[in-house]
């Protein structure tokens, strides 16, 4: 599930959920909505996964 991957990412990076949503999907409520049962679209899921993968590879990687 995407939310589990996001939760791990947030714990490792210390990034606030709203900042993550804004950067990953242009939606500051993304993480809160996913925690409350929202099902992301395939495109959103790909965008979020891409964000997490490229963030890990960048100079700010954890």
What are these regions (language model features)?
Residues 4-19:
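Short basic helix-loop element that most often maps to the first helix and adjoining turn
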Residues 11-12, 21, 36-39:
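Short N-terminal micro-motifs specific to bacterial/archaeal maturation
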Residues 15-30:
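Short alpha-helical DNA-recognition segment
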Residues 32-49:
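Short, basic-rich loop-to-helix N-cap that marks the start of a DNA-contacting helix
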Residues 50-62:
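A short, Lys/Arg-enriched interface patch at domain edges and termini
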